[in-house]
From Swiss-Prot:
S-S pairs: none
Name this protein carries in UniProt: Uncharacterized protein HP_0495
Family named by the database record: To C.jejuni CJ0253.
Ranges that cross the membrane: none
Gene3D superfamilies the UniProt entry points to: 3.30.70.260
Species for this entry: Helicobacter pylori (strain ATCC 700392 / 26695)
Length: 86
């Protein structure tokens, strides 16, 4: 098996970035979700699509382990106005 197919080694806790694409500029539900983790986070507006149909944001926050990182990803992805989470 080639070495490039291995999972990268991530040392936790670490700062993790999520790119969130939404159909609204209103990030209140996203902020509410992130606040439930009771730790600092950074939420930055990044881009608007050409026709202003989508808005992208960058979320940075510390995650304790892979399970928590994946849980946050899933919860963000399930928000009503979220189209995609990367």
């Amino acid at each position: 098996m080639p070495s490039d197919s291995k999972k990268p080694t991530i040392i936790y806790p670490c700062l993790w970035d999520y790119r969130v694409i939404m159909t609204t500029k209103d990030t209140s539900t996203l902020k509410e979700l992130l606040e439930t983790y009771q730790r600092p986070f950074k939420l930055e507006f990044k881009n608007t699509s050409k026709n202003a149909k989508f808005y992208s944001f960058n979320v940075s926050m510390e995650v304790s382990n892979e399970s928590e990182r994946n849980e946050i990803f899933q919860k963000i992805s399930q928000l009503d106005k979220v189209v995609q989470t990367l």
